[in-house]
């Protein structure tokens, strides 16, 4: 089953660059993690200090909860601000679309 794990941090704007660097370094090291298809780092378009990590998983399991990687990331980030850690199950999609430009 495909699912997504989202870790969202609301921190001070001056802390955001170091958090982004840490997350980017982290996701480059996640290659080969069983079940992890992709990991992406996002920032809010209008709110400085809002950062999120999206990890897309494809695993065979019956109970969906935070991953070990996600729990480690959340533990490391919680000292920087307000943290939200959620798991979402995919229930539908409209195919693969590539955007260029």
Predicted segments with their positions:
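Intrinsically disordered, low-complexity regulatory segments enriched
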Residues: 8, 27-28, 62, 93
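Short coil/turn motifs at secondary-structure junctions
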Residues: 12-14, 58-60, 92-97
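Short amphipathic alpha-helical segments
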Residues: 13-38, 68-77
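Generic detector of short, locally flexible boundary/turn motifs and exposed helical patches
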Residues: 3-6, 15-21, 50-53, 95
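Surface-exposed beta-strand edges and their flanking turn/coil or helix-capping segments
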Residues: 19-22, 34, 53-56, 66-68, ...
């Amino acid at each position: 089953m495909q699912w997504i794990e989202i870790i969202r941090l609301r921190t001070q704007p001056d802390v955001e660059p170091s958090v982004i660097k840490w997350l980017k370094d982290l996701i480059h090291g996640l290659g080969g993690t069983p079940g992890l298809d992709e990991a992406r780092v996002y920032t809010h378009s209008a709110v400085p200090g809002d950062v999120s990590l999206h990890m897309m998983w494809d695993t065979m399991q019956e109970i969906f909860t935070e991953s070990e990687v996600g729990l480690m990331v959340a533990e490391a980030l919680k000292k920087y601000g307000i943290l939200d850690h959620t798991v979402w199950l995919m229930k539908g999609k409209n195919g693969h679309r590539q955007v260029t430009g």
